[in-house]
A protein has these predicted regions:
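The serine-hydrolase catalytic nucleophile loop
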Residues: 60-72, 86
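Glycine-rich "HGGG/HGxG" loop immediately N-terminal to the catalytic nucleophile
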Residues: 65, 88-100
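N-terminal cap/lid segment of alpha/beta-hydrolase-fold proteins
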Residues: 2-48
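Alpha/beta-hydrolase-fold enzymes
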Residues: 138-178
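Conserved alpha/beta-hydrolase
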Residues: 73-93
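Alpha/beta-hydrolase fold nucleophile elbow
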Residues: 120-133
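Short beta-strand element of the alpha/beta-hydrolase
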Residues: 48-58
Length: 178
């Protein structure tokens, strides 16, 4: 059973509040019945339907940090954006806390796209997602599954496939491995 979540209404971010955007707290459900908490950012001068972006990550972080800053900055540039806490994290529901699942986390992005696509002020044909750090891969998973996602940005620090093959700093670059 999904527990009722309580949202902090005061500005609780690690970055200053922009005077160029409106901010509000929203929630939406995933297909797994979990409630995700999100910060919605809308340009103050918004007119008509706007393109939208869902943002999450880095892995283990909450929307009051990096993803919120990205979302607010993109709203200043004319997008409707949401930064959400993944399932089991921050203000979102799910037990046990601080649990990760690629399938559930991919669904988190898809649920964010569902939420955005149903808003009257969003152009549902122009929805993008941004995944930061470990969430870059989750964003790619979501984009591969959902044709409504028209653009995907994966902001990742390094190539984990190279690390898997060669070890950190190519430590396993032995003659036998080659």
């Amino acid at each position: 059973m999904d527990k009722e979540i309580k949202l902090v209404q005061d500005w609780d971010k690690t970055f200053p509040k922009s005077e160029k955007v409106k901010h509000e707290k929203v929630t939406f459900k995933t297909q797994y019945g979990l409630t995700l908490a999100a910060d919605l950012y809308i340009p103050k001068n918004a007119e008509g339907k706007l393109p939208a972006i869902a943002v999450s990550g880095p892995f283990g972080a909450v929307k009051e940090q990096c993803s919120g800053l990205y979302a607010q900055t993109m709203a200043e540039r004319g997008f409707i954006t949401i930064a959400f806490d993944p399932s089991f994290t921050g203000e979102s529901s799910g037990e046990p806390r601080r649990t990760a699942s690629p399938d559930i986390n991919t669904e988190d992005f898809l649920a964010a796209v569902d939420y955005l696509s149903m808003r009257d002020d969003v152009d549902a044909g122009r929805i993008a997602i941004i995944g930061i750090c470990g969430w870059g891969g989750i964003a790619l998973n979501a984009a591969a599954q959902d044709p409504r996602i028209k653009a995907t940005v994966a902001i990742t620090m390094y190539d984990m496939s190279r690390v898997s093959g060669n070890g950190y700093f190519d430590a396993d670059d032995s003659e036998e491995k080659r």
